[in-house]
Amino acid sequence: MSCSSSNPSESFLPQDIQDKIHNHPCYSEGAHHHYARIHVAVAPACNIQCNYCNRKYDCSNESRPGVTSERLSPEEAAKKVMFVGGEVKRLSVLGIAGPGDALANPKKTFETFRLVRERASDLKLCLSTNGLELPKFVDEMTKYNIDHVTVTINTVDETGEIGSKIYPWIFYNNKRIYGKEASKILLQRQLEGMKMCVEKGILIKANSVLIPGINDKHLVEVSKKLKEIGVFLHNIMPIISEPEHGTAFGLGGVPSATDQQQMEAQEACGMDMKLMQHCRQCRADAVGLIGEDRGQEFSKNVFNSMSFDELENHYNIKARQESQAKIEEFRFFLDKANERVKKEKAELSSTSETILVAVTSAGQGMIKQHFGTVKEFLIYEAGDLGIRFIHHRKLDVEYCAGPDGANPIEPILAKLKDCKLILTAKIGECPQNDLAGAGLISDQSYANMPIETSVLSATRKYFNISEVYEMNSLPSAEMSRLLQFL
């Protein structure tokens, strides 16, 4: 089986790039259904202040960047990685993403990478940074074969006007710098560092926080500049701005970005750049598949008493390789089952009309989650010619876990107000009727079937498109092999 990408939007990439991202869940939309990541919180300090950020070091009830339940030393982090790698054999990536900035804590960051590289050579290593110190450490990163770096860049305004509204200050060359000057220095360092990374063959993912009224209309210019310097991927992240999080923007009344605002920004920026659309804005101690939070299972007391020798046996690279070979076999047959969708044309619709389809999935690229337990919906745009993934939409509470036993359908209807169709593994009569009353079709006949083919099939089925095909028209051998894995 080839290691080439099973995602149509990635198949045009050079083979060496496809190989780099093939099992990286953040850089490959296809991989995120199958491979897990771990973030270790070894970097508490930060060298800039962002108005959308409030770091918390002992927080278990918030799901956003900058928070962690516990900080780790490099040795503790390496032990955690090895323990988790033995438990979660689909783990493919170690990232350092805070709770501060990885490169504002260089000794801890690179000591962690050294310890892990010596003992878990099969993992990809990556880090996340604001970019202020990036030029200084590019050569150091290459020593550890760190070939994926994420840089948060929210403006390319050379006057510093936009940046001064986002960053009150930076700490650079042993002094605190404020206002427009701070923003201009930060931008210069970000661009310089990203260019150096590109020259070294390091893939750059750029994160941009979508801040309504401040940089929302400017992100198109950010995307153009990123493409110009060779950045691989652009991720538009809606600002999380609830007052209870204690950020300057949240307390100052700057609202969280809406799903619609994110979609509009992605549409505008996607003309220039390849976009990441499956981001979940992970915590600094995230563990598991993207969209899955298993961090609370792996606190220090679980692994800290174990020696490195014990942990190497527990990690068991051979068993991990065997497990990941099975994942690749599953992906191969999933790709075959979705083959007809992979041949989609550039246009999604022959009439320019498309709909939004919501899907419930617990991973693996399959429709396999009950409506009542869903914590997020995957949103696809679909027409008669093809489909494309848009983004995910989180729910604050599951339908079957509402307060006082209530089933909160109203928040779900609000989340899906622009959708026409929901595909789910199972749904009860009451929510199905509620959805129908709001004009939403729900269908559970595609349970345990591939998402992509199901979305296209259901769109054609329900919206009077002539060329309808059902799941039994899929290649029977591939579907049979695929279902053996479930």
Task: Put a short name on every predicted segment.
Residues 76-97, 312-323:
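Short Fe-S-cluster ligation motifs
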Residues 2-5, 43-58, 277-289, 433:
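Local cysteine-cluster metal-coordination motifs and their immediate loop/turn environment
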Residues 328-407, 411-414, 418, 443-486:
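Non-catalytic interface/targeting segments
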Residues 257-338:
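C-terminal accessory regions of radical SAM enzymes
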Residues 1-41, 55-69, 83, 87-90, ...:
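N-terminal [4Fe-4S]-dependent radical SAM core
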Residues 412-441:
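Mid-chain, well-packed structural core segment of small domains
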Residues 103-237, 242:
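Conserved AdoMet/S-adenosylmethionine-binding subsite of the radical SAM
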Residues 147-152, 439-450:
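Short hydrophobic/aromatic-enriched beta-strand-loop microsegments
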